[in-house]
Amino acid sequence: MYQINDVIVYENGGVCKIADIGVPDFVTTEERYYKLQPICDNGGTIYVKLNSNKVFMRSVITKEEAENYLSEVHELEEIYSANDKLRDKEFQEAIKSCEFKRCLQVMKGITMERNRRNKTGKKLNMSDDRNLQRAGKLIAAECSVIFDISIEQAKMKIQAAMGAEE
């Protein structure tokens, strides 16, 4: 069980801080909920049942784990299928898993494809671009918390790690 002020990764809300644990006003039962405040969205609030098995939540990874993943991104196997439908499905599953490593693999695969396309004057398709943004937002938010830096600084840190791929 998580505690108030813990920072977690939530499947649909990204990186969130647990603002409260209790029974919200809108609930008619005594069921307790986590009240989540997304790190990247100052106005949003998410309520998740305390004992829900249907929702994926995890603690943020450690600073050491993040540093290892970022420093070894060149060794990670990228996720990028030639089949558009299969690729989109793989991306969606990886992003929904909220796993730091899998999201980095998505970013690496799409970044490598973007670089290949740039050489021939082509752009990424909209689906790949959208998935790159989603994975990047999740990783940047988690890095921001882990390294205690701004989202922009986290994006630059990730881009620097990915830059080793180019």
Please report, for each region that a protein language model flagged, where it lies by residue.
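Charge/polar-rich, low-complexity and marginally structured segments
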Residues: N51, V55-E166
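A positional/architectural concept
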Residues: M1-V55
